[in-house]
Amino acid sequence: GYGAQMAEITVDTELGLLKINKITAAHDLGKTINPLLAEGQIEGGIAQGIGFALMEEYIPSKTENLHDYLIPSIGDVPEIESILIEKNDPEGPFGARGLGEHVLIPTAPAIMNALRNATGAIITKLPALPDRILEAIEISKNGSK
């Protein structure tokens, strides 16, 4: 399927903290068989994408458990507006398309594009941790290190 997402964020440029205020997600799922489950799938994929974008970093011997390897909780997930685009798929069951991984994929780019639009910062390594955000903001203001 096809999809697009937009993130609305607030950035604390002194601390490098990024807060997601809202994500708008439009996804083509063919014929929507169960709208409530489709919206839940979109919300879950976005939560995973937030983790990829801002939190989850595997460091051998340091982040090998869920105490040290951070994943999003309900407090990290912003308001989500889901737009279900329906265009029957002649190949899919009852005209439906799959709605899985392609929800996760555009989340990190949407957040990073919002960060760049707000601050000029270009993040080259995920997750976008506060120190990486501060460094990218500094580079955007003054050129390379």
What is the meaning of each model-derived region?
Residues 1-145:
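C-terminal catalytic domains of large/alpha subunits in multi-subunit enzymes
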